[in-house]
Swiss-Prot record:
Main location: periplasm
Record key words, sorted: Periplasm, Signal
Signal peptide segment: 1-20
Name the record gives this protein: Uncharacterized protein HI_0045
Superkingdom field: Bacteria
Record localization: Periplasm
Gene Ontology CC terms, in alphabetical order: periplasmic space
Organism (species): Haemophilus influenzae (strain ATCC 51907 / DSM 11121 / KW20 / Rd)
Length: 184
């Protein structure tokens, strides 16, 4: 009996990794709105926040980078972001959307996360940057805490690729090939 209980407990603990995202290929992302903070937009040299919703993702091919407000999460897929920048995709057909989960930041670093998000928008004005202070996106999409996710959407908003955690070199090539094909 003890072995059965131990097996059950271990099964529950180790199967938690299978409780990952609820995103499905060829489907739209689950609807979500971020009303507190939200999308960072430029207003002259300043930045302002406006409400954002996932319905805004349709219309362009996108790489959506959702990440916890932690340095480790940002660094996990920085090589993917660097390759995207170097690819110089047509901004009429393509846009990167970065969603930063400020609710999933190390205690006491919230202001740094917010300021970093604003700076990121100023440095990449053509990108869409969203600051989520309530984990709304993470919860709606079932994403892991303390992590990074890369999602490729076609111009209708359908998921073409999704992976949580660090992308391999092969994953990065897959993403770039997908975006190239979808933007032709």
């Amino acid at each position: 009996m003890k072995k059965q209980i131990l097996a059950l407990v271990c099964g529950v603990i180790f199967s938690s990794s299978t409780w990952a995202h609820n995103l499905q290929l060829e489907q739209s992302l689950p609807s979500v709105k971020v009303s507190e903070y939200g999308e960072i937009v430029l207003s002259g040299k300043d930045t302002v926040f406006q409400p954002w919703g996932s319905a805004e993702l349709a219309g362009k091919v996108r790489v959506v980078h959702h990440l916890a407000g932690r340095t480790a999460a940002k660094e996990x897929n920085q090589s993917m972001i660097d390759v995207i920048k170097a690819s110089h995709f047509n901004p009429v057909k393509y846009q990167t959307t970065t969603i930063i989960n400020a609710d999933d930041a190390i205690v006491g670093t919230g202001m740094f996360v917010k300021n970093g998000a604003k700076k990121g928008k100023q440095e990449n004005p053509h990108s869409q940057v969203v600051l989520d202070d309530k984990s709304a996106v993470k919860n709606a999409w079932g994403l892991n805490s303390k992590d990074s996710a890369i999602i490729v959407l076609d111009k209708t908003g359908k998921v073409k690729f999704v992976k949580e955690g660090k992308l391999s070199d092969s994953d990065i090539q897959t993403v770039i090939s997908l975006v190239n094909g979808l933007t032709k």
